[in-house]
């Protein structure tokens, strides 16, 4: 039996089509996230309970703060830099720009600021890949990916977790900060279809991972042994990702409102949620621009 958590609050009424990729910005003390299909990048300020947004021409799969005064955006054909208002957009590196129908999806930095992110096609065929993006270039870590999604690390940085949603599981591998490309994934935990589709995730200081389940109306925590320990019951069905406020046990959760034309059916769908889960999250790093002409 897992501990059931229900006291989830609406943090921001964003009504995203496909809210995704929440990440805490330590420098600005704010949360960034994206609406992939709505083509927007959001910034939520919990101290004022307010948010701002800017639109993008391409679909943003992820937004990552950098070690300079800029944001990194994972867009359809690669990674870009812009300022915090979405201005001065410039491509940093092309990723699969030659593969028709593919786009960047979820991305996250390791403890040394190196970016891991993946691509996907139509969500049904394994046309995507998983990449390490650092030092001015990109290295393919895994091929034949269908829907590249959640990424997380253990608190000691010795394990990397990864989700290709089509596999209905979380993969893991030993990880070395000295040799980050040396990754050999194997299955960590499989999920029944009744859980929904595994999407984004994050990790906590006790070694657990928090997995968002699209179509499952829940975020679930699994110990480092793969045992289900906590279930956050959500008031909406399409749960996409989650991220901790750095240094706290406050978990932010993004959601979607796909194919919900009547808002009365699910009035809270697509909003940003928050809940104190009682376990502190693993801090996330900004993207290190070393090696890039930026």
Indicate where each model-derived feature is located.
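Blade-level signature of beta-propeller repeat domains, shared across WD40, Kelch, NHL, RCC1
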Residues: 243-294
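Flexible "stalk/tail and boundary" regions
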Residues: 67-69, 84-85, 131-137, 220-230, ...
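Short loop/turn segments immediately following beta-strands, especially the blade-tip
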Residues: 173-180, 277-282
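Conserved beta-strand positions in repeat-built beta-propeller and related beta-rich domains
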Residues: 25-26, 31-36, 72-77, 117-124, ...
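A short loop-to-beta-strand structural motif that recurs across blades of beta-propeller domains
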Residues: 40-42, 78-80, 128-131, 169-171, ...
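A short beta-strand motif characteristic of beta-propeller blades
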Residues: 7-13, 49-55, 90-97, 137-143, ...
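Hydrophobic alpha-helical segments and helix pairs
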Residues: 87-141
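Beta-rich, blade/repeat-based domains predominating
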Residues: 13-28, 57-72, 98-114, 141-159, ...
């Amino acid at each position: 039996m897992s501990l059931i958590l229900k006291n989830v609050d609406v943090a921001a009424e964003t009504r995203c089509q496909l809210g995704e990729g929440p990440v805490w910005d330590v420098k600005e003390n704010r949360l960034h996230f994206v609406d992939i299909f709505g083509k927007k990048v959001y910034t939520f300020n919990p101290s004022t309970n307010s948010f701002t947004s800017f639109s993008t021409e391409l679909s943003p799969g992820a937004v990552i703060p950098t070690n300079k005064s800029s944001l990194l955006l994972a867009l359809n054909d690669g990674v870009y830099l812009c300022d915090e208002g979405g201005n001065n957009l410039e491509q940093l590196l092309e990723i699969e720009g030659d593969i028709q129908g593919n786009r960047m999806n979820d991305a996250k930095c390791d403890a040394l600021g190196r970016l891991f992110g993946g691509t996907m096609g139509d969500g049904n065929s394994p046309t995507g890949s998983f990449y390490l993006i650092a030092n001015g270039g990109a290295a393919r870590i895994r091929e034949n990916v269908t829907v590249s999604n959640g990424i997380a690390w253990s608190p000691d940085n010795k394990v990397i977790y990864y989700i290709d949603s089509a596999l209905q599981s979380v993969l893991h591998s030993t990880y070395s900060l000295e040799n980050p490309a040396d990754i050999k994934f194997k299955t960590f935990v499989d999920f029944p279809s009744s859980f929904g589709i595994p999407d984004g995730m994050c990790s906590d200081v006790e070694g657990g991972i928090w997995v968002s389940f699209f179509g499952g109306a829940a975020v679930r925590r699994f110990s480092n042994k793969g045992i289900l320990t906590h279930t956050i019951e959500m008031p909406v069905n399409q749960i996409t990702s989650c991220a901790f406020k750095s240094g706290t046990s406050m978990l932010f959760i993004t959601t979607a409102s796909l194919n919900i034309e009547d808002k009365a059916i699910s009035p809270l769908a697509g909003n940003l949620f928050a809940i104190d889960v009682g376990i502190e999250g693993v801090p996330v790093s900004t993207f290190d621009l070393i090696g890039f002409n930026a």
